[in-house]
Regions:
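Alpha-helical transmembrane segments in multi-pass membrane proteins
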Residues: 3-59
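Residue-level signature of transmembrane alpha-helical entry/exit and packing/kink sites
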Residues: 5-13, 37-41, 68-76, 114-119, ...
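Transmembrane helix-loop-helix hairpins at the membrane interface
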Residues: 20, 114-214
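Structural signal for membrane-spanning alpha-helices in multi-pass inner-membrane proteins
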Residues: 20-25, 48-56, 83, 87, ...
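Short helix-capping/hinge motifs at transmembrane helix termini and TM-loop junctions
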Residues: 24-31, 55-56, 94-99, 163-170, ...
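Membrane-interface helix-boundary motifs at transmembrane edges
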Residues: 30-33, 61-68, 143-146, 186
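Non-cytosolic membrane-interface motifs at loop->transmembrane helix junctions
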Residues: 32-40, 101-109, 172-180
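Juxtamembrane helix-loop-helix connectors linking adjacent transmembrane helices
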Residues: 60-126
Length: 214
């Protein structure tokens, strides 16, 4: 990334982020299980994928030297399960707060449709797509533009700001936690194996278990 002009590096970060946010806004406004919902999620995935195909590291799923894929995936899954448990405990409280519970219940309606397999597939694809963009493309671009600490903060802030488009307040807390821990894993290992495992274990767990609360 360092050999690319600063303006291009900024565009690599901002253009997909804006397009992705617009797609997520479309997802949020689409009726549960509708063709519009699945089309919007497909568009969001394509935004992340195209950004990675253009500027991503093809070795981003290779384990760090001296480490193994199993170890890094295990760390990611372990952290994802811990965060899942914390969020489910939080759901016991937030389900009684109408302003917080209603948007979550609307989002969870997508897990109550006949084509559940399609919803889960889009969830997984977009989880992987977000990691390809935020924890590979955007991370490396920001690392080339800012100090390590500033880059980490900007990575998390970017992820939270894009998630705002979903219009679900509790997702902002989720994006803050997931954004921080996945960014730390990506920095530690220099790839997105652990980050993707964390993201998918948390998001799929939330998708199947949160409807029990809302």
């Amino acid at each position: 990334m360092e050999n690319k002009p600063v303006a291009l590096r900024l565009a690599i970060i901002l253009v997909p982020a804006v397009l992705g946010a617009a797609s997520l806004g479309w997802v949020s406004s689409s009726p549960a299980g509708s063709a519009s919902f699945y089309l919007a999620t497909a568009v969001a995935f394509l935004v992340w994928l195209i950004a990675w195909l253009g500027f991503g590291d093809r070795r981003c799923f290779s384990p760090r030297a001296g480490s193994t894929a199993a170890r890094e995936l295990g760390v990611g899954v372990g952290l994802g399960v811990v965060l899942l448990g914390i969020f489910l405990l939080g759901a016991l409280v937030t389900r009684n707060i109408l302003v917080l519970a209603e948007p979550v219940a609307g989002l969870m309606d997508n897990m109550r449709v006949d084509a559940l397999w399609a919803t889960v597939l889009t969830l997984v694809l977009n989880g992987v797509g977000e990691e390809l963009f935020f924890r590979d493309v955007a991370r490396r671009a920001l690392d080339s533009l800012a100090s390590p600490a500033a880059s980490l903060g900007l990575q998390v802030a970017l992820y939270v700001l894009v998630t705002v488009a979903m219009g679900v307040p509790l997702l902002l807390v989720g994006s803050l936690c997931i954004g921080l821990f996945t960014a730390l894993l990506a920095r530690r290992y220099g790839n997105i194996l652990g980050a993707t495992a964390l993201h998918l274990s948390w998001s799929t767990g939330m998708a199947f278990l949160l409807p029990l609360f809302f």
